[in-house]
């Protein structure tokens, strides 16, 4: 009886795909696929299916942990800003601190919303059914909620726990206020760039191997150097201003959160994921044609062997 319940629950959160309909796994072996790009696409799509099928509470706790971890970006950048004041090239080194949170989150396999703007989207693009779209909305909603909760806890701790000196706290305020200098349209435009760069980073992971951490550092450092906006890192920075009384709660929602969230989704999903999926559509068509041809040839061989037994 219990096993039946478990099976029913698993069926409810199963991604619909052509492979599952045929009882097969996603092919990720480059030698068996038409192109290297398709091998990367299929590898990421496989990861996306796993994320879409995860239990909601597991996703939530992982997302909260990711939000807390992203506090390391504000922490490192603030400390670097104070300690490196007056040092030549300090701007480059300060922004290197921005990468710390991403390194922790990605290497620890925690749930980051902007990663899922490409990873979890590919299975839906492959088979855009209402069930798959529902799973994507569920994943995005749970992970975004968890990330915001985690960043809120981190920001609260930075403000109210006796951890940092006044110089570091002032640096946190300056970092947050630099973000708030952007207009809503600038928030949106900058977020498109950061969403696109995060999606590019995710696309590079399958080929990165042991150099994955280098890819994380380079891509997220570039996000920081470009003063782009990111919904999760920015939430730590802006919520810190809310908790110390510099900003009202409404300022977090607008002009920051809504334009930034829309920009990240646009950059990661509507630009990068669509383009990446489009480039391998013909490869997928050719793969299906090759499979159909092989199936027909096998059937023909079986028929010949049946007519002409040895």
Swiss-Prot record:
Residues 1-27, 291-310 are annotated as: Disordered. GO terms for molecular function: formate transmembrane transporter activity. Residues 1-58, 114-133, 207-212, 275-310 are cytoplasmic. It is a multi-pass membrane protein. It is found in: Cell inner membrane. It comes from the Bacteria. GO terms for cellular component: plasma membrane. The chain crosses the membrane at residues 59-81, 91-113, 134-156, 187-206, 213-232, 252-274. Residues 82-90, 157-186, 233-251 are periplasmic. One of its GO terms (biological process) is formate transport. Keywords: Cell inner membrane, Cell membrane, Membrane, Transmembrane, Transmembrane helix. Signal peptide: none annotated. Its main location: membrane. InterPro entries: Aquaporin-like, For/NO2_transpt. PANTHER family: FORMATE TRANSPORTER-RELATED (PTHR30520), INNER MEMBRANE PROTEIN YFDC (PTHR30520:SF2). This is Inner membrane protein YfdC. The gene is yfdC.
